[in-house]
Amino acid sequence: MPASIGGLPLPRICPHFLTLRVAIRAHLTDHVHIGLSGGPDSLALVAAARAEGAEVTAICINHNLQEGSAEVSERAAAQAEHMGATALIRSITVPPGSMEAQAREARYAEFAQLTDTIWAGHTMDDQAETFLLAGLRGNPAGMKSASRRPDLTVIRPLLGVRRADTHGACTELGLTPWQDPQNRDRAFRRVAIREQVLPLLAEIHAGDPVPGLALAATRAAMEGEALEFFVDKRRGEWADGFPVRLAAEPHALRRLMLADFLRGHGVRVTSKKIEAVDRLLTHWHGQGGVAVGGGAHGRLEVVRVSGKLEITG
């Protein structure tokens, strides 16, 4: 282990930090870009990547959602630079709507302006919380270690690492991370799950529920990835309308195919729309078309014509 990273000396014995270093090795490249909030997870991730010899560019996003957010970004950037990383600060405007979702999309859009691959500090605990949140929305799913968006790949090297290790690593290295006050506000569902639901599950389960939930999330993510693979392979089948014969496909695969078909025509996909369109395949009795939103030329509608589904509007 190096004696220091930049101007930060490294202690000889630091088991939490070693856990992080081992975890990231499978994802390591010569130069990595890391989304740095200044919190324990991303700060420890920057330190681990630097200790493993990577050149690091830390991208600090000021979402302008909290008082003092500019100072938080500046402090995080200074900490990264002290560890020998390059730091960039970007200020963004988050559109109205679901704050967590809109902030994430705005942040990823900004990352995509700077790199094609970004590391995120999500841990096993985040994975378990995400699985429960997604389940409440009727779509139990997990984060993948590598998520590919149209313009950005998100790498999550710490999904197998506990939050206690990132916090412990910061303590071992003498780093003082930013503690987001919103992480204590139970008005946010994720915080309520973290502070109320998971402790109750631990009591009922008579043990830590996080590893099992995280494993379920990982399996859901892998199964989803397999289905997406088949959709990618078969996309040409619905390039000129969605064939009615695909009604024979398994429901889960057919839903993804329909979602891909709709997105290809600029439709904002929801479960309700997919189910309504699916009935044109599986419960056909001559009914009219299904409205799926507005397009550039007006109302969009899916209709069944001559053995296939078409979008008009």
Curated annotation (Swiss-Prot):
Catalytic activity from the UniProt record: cytidine(34) in tRNA(Ile2) + L-lysine + ATP = lysidine(34) in tRNA(Ile2) + AMP + diphosphate + H(+)
The UniProt record lists the keyword Cytoplasm: yes
Annotated localization: Cytoplasm
GO biological process per UniProt: tRNA modification
One Gene Ontology molecular-function label: tRNA(Ile)-lysidine synthase activity
E.C. designation(s): 6.3.4.19
Top-level taxon of origin: Bacteria
Coiled coil: none
Binding residues annotated for ATP, in chain numbering: 37-42
InterPro entries: Rossmann-like_a/b/a_fold, TilS/TtcA_N, tRNA_Ile_lys_synt, tRNA_Ile_lys_synt_N, tRNA_Ile_lys_synt_subst-bd
Example of a GO cellular component annotation carried by this entry: cytoplasm
Keywords for the protein's UniProt record, in alphabetical order: ATP-binding, Cytoplasm, Ligase, Nucleotide-binding, tRNA processing
Key word ATP-binding present: yes
The record's note on its domains: The N-terminal region contains the highly conserved SGGXDS motif, predicted to be a P-loop motif involved in ATP binding.
NCBIfam families: lysidine_TilS_N (TIGR02432)
Family: Belongs to the tRNA(Ile)-lysidine synthase family.
Role according to the record: Ligates lysine onto the cytidine present at position 34 of the AUA codon-specific tRNA(Ile) that contains the anticodon CAU, in an ATP-dependent manner. Cytidine is converted to lysidine, thus changing the amino acid specificity of the tRNA from methionine to isoleucine.
UniProt protein name: tRNA(Ile)-lysidine synthase
Originating species: Corynebacterium efficiens (strain DSM 44549 / YS-314 / AJ 12310 / JCM 11189 / NBRC 100395)
Classification of source organism: Bacteria, Bacillati, Actinomycetota, Actinomycetes, Mycobacteriales
